[in-house]
Amino acid sequence: MATLERKLVEMLKAPVEALGHKLWGLEYIQAGKHSILRLYIDNEKGIFIEDCAEASRQVSAVMDVEDPISTEYTLEVSSPGVDRPLFTAEQYQAYIGETVKVQLTMPVAGSRNLKGTVTGVDGQMLNLSVDGNELIVALDNIRKGNLIAKF
């Protein structure tokens, strides 16, 4: 996770939790002159559109005061959904035995894109079974990770 994203998580965690939600994670996507700050919130009951709107208002107020992003950006707030993005060791740990897709910064076993079953998490290392091969991936090498939903 980049330094700005870490700062944003620290800044926005408390306001989201004050609403009774958990800050599942966030993505800051730079797209030319305009950027997107995407927050994922969750709770045990599920997230509804009203929850997203309320969190958006709360987060906007904090962002206006703190002003951590100097360029124009769009704030998006949503639930993680069924193909939820995974950001932390704890989140990967919760999905041991499930299939995930990860995009890597640096290749592992010759690939930057892996799809496999989470077999464990050891500190900041993800154990992943890909086509019968056990791979170890550093969490800081994961650019993006998502749970693959089963239907």
From Swiss-Prot:
It is found in: Cytoplasm. This is Ribosome maturation factor RimP. Its main location: cytoplasm. InterPro entries: Ribosome_maturation_RimP, RimP_C, RimP_C_sf, RimP_N, RimP_N_sf. Belongs to the RimP family. HAMAP family: RimP (MF_01077). Pfam families: DUF150_C, RimP_N. Keywords: Cytoplasm, Ribosome biogenesis. One of its GO terms (cellular component) is cytosol. The keyword Transcription does not apply. GO terms for biological process: ribosomal small subunit assembly; translation. Required for maturation of 30S ribosomal subunits. It comes from Shewanella pealeana (strain ATCC 700345 / ANG-SQ1).
